[in-house]
Amino acid sequence: MNMEQEDDQVPAVAAETVPLKRYVTNPGANRDEEVAAAPSSQDTPYFDYAYERSLRHQDAKFLAMNGTQNGRDGLPSKSPRRPSVSASTVRNSDDVNHSKAGPGSGKLLNDTLQSKISSIHMPHVQQGDNAVVSSVGGPETDPGNMETTDPLFSDELAEIYLSIHKCMDMRHKYIRVSLQGELDNPIDDDSWIIYPDCKEGEDDTGLFNFADCKIPGIENEMEYHMDHQGIFQVYENDSAYIAGTPSFHIPTIRDYYIDLEFLLSASSDGPSKSFSFRRLQYLEGRWNMYMLLNEYQELADTKKVPHRDFYNVRKVDTHVHHSALANQKHLLRFIKAKLRKCPNEKVIWRDGKFLTLQEVFDSLKLTSYDLSIDTLDMHAHTDTFHRFDKFNLKYNPIGESRLRTIFLKTDNDINGRYLAELTKEVFTDLRTQKYQMAEYRISIYGRNREEWDKLAAWIIDNELFSPNVRWLIQVPRLYDVYKKSGIVETFEEVVRNVFEPLFEVTKDPRTHPKLHVFLQRVIGFDSVDDESKPERRTFRKFPYPKHWDINLNPPYSYWLYYMYANMTSLNSWRKIRGFNTFVLRPHCGEAGDTDHLASAFLLSHGINHGILLRKVPFLQYLWYLDQIPIAMSPLSNNALFLAYDKNPFLTYFKRGLNVSLSTDDPLQFAFTREPLIEEYAVAAQIYKLSAVDMCELARNSVLQSGFERQLKERWLGVDFQDIDRTNVPIIRLAYRALTLTQEIALVNKHVQPSKHPSNHDLEELIHKYDAMTGTSDPLSASPRTNDATISSRLSLHDGHDHGAFFPGLSVISERRRRKDSMASSSQDLKD
C-alpha cells in the first residue's frame, strides 16, 4: 500500500502544524540526541521516510484493533467518532445547496431522493455483515473526504478549500447581481402567460395575432444614460442622474479584472491543480463503481416505466445557429423547389439592376439539374480542421456569397422571405417530432441601431413562433472588421448599437412594439467568433470603450464584461417592469486561450463547447461544484478542433458535470433531417452510452434551456425528477445529488468554524498522550497503547468520550515534542 492510500485513513485536524527544522537520520537512536546531532545543511520540514512509516504504524494498529474489537473480519465498525451513515445526516446537508447557481438546483436531496438512497449499492463504507452503504450523510462519512489525509497537509488543504470557496463566492456575486439565477426570471413565475399558448405537436398555424399582444407604456420616471465607463446606467429620475446615483450597482471593470486575476492565479496554483485533479479522478472512479453495481438495477427501473423511452422524452438543442438550422439535403431541396416554382422572382440587386432567381443561376452557369450536395459544398470535411476561416466559407452555397444573401439572410432585398419559409419548414419538422425543442442563435452585429427593429419585424411579420423554439441573440466579435471598414469609430458605438434599443423598449415598449413582443421569446445573449485568434496586449491598462479606437479587436474578457455589465443593468430594470430577463451563454473553451473559461465562469450562466476545460482541472472542478451548464457538440469539434475520440464529453459526463448534447451547425455537420437525434446516436455508438445515459443527457438539456419553468415542470415533473416523464431512474438522480452534496459539503466545511480541537486543546491531548504512555516516544510505547486505548482511559478518567483522539495523533505528538525540544535547544544556545 502506498503512502497516499494509508493517508486516506487518517482524519485531518484543523490545527496549526509547525514544520521541523532538522532531518532525522537514525530513527532507532534516542531522538533528543538525533535532533541535536542532525546537520543544519539538511534542514527540512519532513521526517525521515522510515521513521515516519514507523510512526504511522501506530495508526494502522489503531484501525486494525478498532475493527476487530467491534466488527468482523477486520472491517471497521461504527464508532463514536465516526457517526453511522443515515438518512438523517443527509437531511442536514441542505445548507450546502445555496452554493449552486445553476438551473434546476434547488434542494439537491429531496424526500424522494433520500428514500431511494438506501438502494444505491456503493460499498465504500463497510457496515457490519451487510458491507453496503445505506446512505451517505456528509463529508465525515464520504470515502473521498480529504479530511482523512495526513495532518501535515491540513494547512495547505485549508488554503485550497478557501480558494475554491472564494472563487465560488465571486461567481455567485456576479450571477446574483445580473439576475441569472434559477428563479430570478419572471417567466419562471406561475403567473407568466405564454403567448401563443400551444402544446408541442399541435398545429400552431394562425394562432399568433400581433393585434392580441398587449403593449404597455411608460410606468415611472426611470431614465437611462451611458456612463463614462461604457455601461448603460438606470436612474430613478433626472435628479438622480444629475446627482450621479444609479439605481443598480454594476461591478466595475476594475473589480472584474481583480477577481479574474485571483481566479487565474488560483487555477494555476500547483497544489490547487493537484487537488482538483485528484478530486475529479475520485469522482470518475466513484461513477465507475456505481455503474458496476447498479447498471442492471437502472435497466430494470426503466423497463417498469410505460410509454417512455429515449425517443419520447423531451430534449432541447441548446446550441444551434439559425443560419445553419437545416441540413444540406433540406436546403438543396428548398433551392431546387424555388428555382422550379418561381424562377422569375426578383431576388437581389446587382450591377445596377434587380436580378431574378433564374438570372442569378445563369450567371453562375448552373441549372437545377446541376445542383447536388457536392455542388453546394457546405459540409465541413477534413479541410476545415483548425481552419476556422475555411469553415466560415462553408456558409456560402456553391461558394457564392450571393446565394447566402438570398437564401440564408434575414436582411436582404426580399426581406428574408426565403429564410423565413425555410425556418417554417424546420418548425414543422419539430412540431411533427413533438419531443424535440431548439434554441436558435440569430445575429445582431452592432453595426447600427436599426438591426433590432429589422430582426423583430422579420420574426413578427413572418409569424415565426413555435412552442418548440426559443431564441438567443449572438453578437459576433467583429469590431476590428467594422473599424477597418469605417462603419464605427470606437468600441462604444458597438455597445450602444447592441444595447440602446433594448433600453428604449424597456422604458416605453410603444416605441418598438414588435421588438417588445419578440423579446418575450428571447432568452439570452451569446458571444461568437473564432476563439483561436491571438489577443495582443496593446495596453498596460485597458481603456474604456469610448477610448478604444484602434483597429485591433478587444480581448475576449473585455467583450464579455461589457456584454455582461449592460445586460445586468437591463435585467434589473426589466424585472422591475415585470418583463423577462436574459442570461449570458457565450461560446467558450472551443479553442484559444484557457483564460476565456475564467471570464465565463465569473460572468455567464452557461457556455457552449467547453472542451478546453480538460486542460484546467481547477476550473473543471469549479464547473462541477456549481453545475454550470455546458452544451457540447462533439461532431462540430471533430470537424474543427478536436478528434471525436479525444473529446472530453464522456469524461465530463462520468464526473458529473452538467453537460448536454447539441448540434451547433446542422448545415455543416448533419446528414439527416433530425440532427439532434443524429448527435445522440453517434455519441451513443462511440461512447457506448446506455439508454439511461441518453435520457439523463436529455433531461440535462431541458434544465439548461431557457424555456419557462411551467413547461419544464410539464416535461420533467414538478421537481424535475419524475421517472414517468424523464425515464431517468431515481437511483441515478439520487447518486448524482448525493455525490454533489458531499463535494459541496467538503468545501463548505472548511470555511465554517472548525469543530476540531483548538491548538490549546491539542496541546493538552498531546501531553495526556505522553503521560499515559509513560514515555514521550510513541515507538517505545506498548503495541496496545494506541489512540483507542488513550481515548478509553481518558473516558474513565474524566467521564467524557474524547472523540478528538484520532488516527495520526502520534505523528502530531512527535512533531509538537520536537518543536518544543528545538525551542529549548535554541534557548540554551542563546543563554
From Swiss-Prot:
Region described as Disordered: spans on this chain: 26-45, 66-110, 130-149
Positions binding Zn(2+) in this chain are: 319, 321, 587, 664
Could you confirm whether the keyword Zinc appears in this record?
yes
Task: From the UniProt annotation, give the residues forming the signal peptide.
Answer: none
Q: Which reaction does it catalyse?
A: AMP + H2O + H(+) = IMP + NH4(+)
**Subcellular location(s) of the protein:** Cytoplasm
Q: Which InterPro entries match?
A: A/AMP_deam_AS (IPR006650), AMPD (IPR006329), Metal_Hydrolase (IPR032466)
> What are the required cofactors?
Zn(2+)
GO MF terms on file? AMP deaminase activity; metal ion binding
Disulfide cysteine pairs (residue numbers): none
Q: Which GO terms describe its biological process?
A: AMP metabolic process; IMP biosynthetic process; IMP salvage
Q: Record's family?
A: Belongs to the metallo-dependent hydrolases superfamily. Adenosine and AMP deaminases family.
What is annotated about its quaternary structure and interactions?
Answer: Homotetramer.
- This chain's protein is named AMP deaminase
